[in-house]
């Protein structure tokens, strides 16, 4: 189920891209009928139909509302050049040429909701990350690497607050992310990922009982 819809030009671009190029992207498969694709994002699966201009979650929570930003992110992934293998080099957004200029002010990494939700609850953050298929890392007080797409990991490093410093979260990326996405989509990727991380833990949130990771896939493709 969608909310606000992507602009028609996003769909036009996707319809114009050769189908074999789209299907070469990790985590993307063809559905047996029509021209739709199945795309994995974290532990969920989505139908993306460029002919009907429709995106739906098929598993585990088909009734999940999908933001405009999320829908654009999926389409832009399907339009992205193949960024190749992971380099294994972790970098911050400001390590990219021009990153220090772009990723500030309104484009600072949108991680504040994670800080508010988990700044004093590191183990709850770990538990939530594991629900989404994340891997624990040995950085900060706790850190988790999420795989929104198979070859585009995002690592959240959480430092719990103390008497001297407030809690904080930073993001790290494999250097190859810049071969997949421009800066605006790296920002959108973190925005969407942050929303998904805090989603289940939001006060008063209503979650579908099927939203338990039943669609979790092994998407750790490194070639």
Question: What do the predicted segments below correspond to?
Answer:
Residues 1-35, 70, 77-132:
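Short Lys/Arg-enriched alpha/beta "domain-start" segment
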Residues 100-111, 139-140, 178-181, 194:
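Domain-length accessory/inserted modules outside core catalytic folds
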Residues 163-223:
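Alpha-helical oligomerization segments
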Residues 68-82, 188-196:
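Short, hydrophobic/amphipathic alpha-helical patches that form generic packing surfaces
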Residues 120-179:
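Conserved binding-pocket/active-site segment within a compact domain
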Residues 3, 9-21, 146-147, 201-205, ...:
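Surface-exposed peri-terminal alpha-helical interaction modules
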Residues 44-72, 159-184:
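Intrinsically disordered, low-complexity regulatory segments enriched in Ser/Thr/Pro
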Residues 16-61:
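N-terminal domain-start signal
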């Amino acid at each position: 189920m969608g909310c606000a819809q992507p602009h028609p030009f996003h769909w036009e671009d996707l319809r114009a891209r050769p189908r074999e190029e789209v299907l070469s992207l990790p985590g993307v498969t063809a559905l047996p009928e029509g021209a739709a694709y199945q795309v994995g994002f974290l532990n969920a699966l989505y139908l993306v139909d460029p002919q009907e201009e429709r995106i739906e979650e098929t598993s585990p929570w088909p009734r999940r509302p999908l933001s405009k930003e999320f829908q654009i992110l999926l389409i832009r992934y399907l339009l992205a050049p193949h960024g190749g293998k992971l380099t294994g080099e972790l970098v911050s957004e400001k390590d990219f040429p021009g990153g220090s200029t772009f990723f500030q002010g309104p484009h600072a990494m949108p991680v504040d909701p994670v800080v508010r939700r988990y700044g004093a609850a590191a183990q709850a953050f770990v538990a939530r990350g594991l629900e989404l298929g994340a891997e624990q890392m040995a950085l900060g007080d706790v850190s988790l690497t999420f795989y929104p797409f198979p070859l585009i990991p995002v690592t959240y490093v959480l430092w719990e607050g103390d008497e001297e410093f407030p809690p904080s979260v930073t993001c790290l990326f494999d250097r190859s992310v810049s071969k997949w996405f421009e800066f605006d989509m790296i920002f959108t990727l973190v925005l969407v990922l942050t929303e998904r991380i805090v989603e289940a833990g939001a006060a008063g949130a209503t979650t579908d009982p099927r939203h338990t990771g039943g669609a979790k896939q092994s998407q750790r493709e490194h070639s």
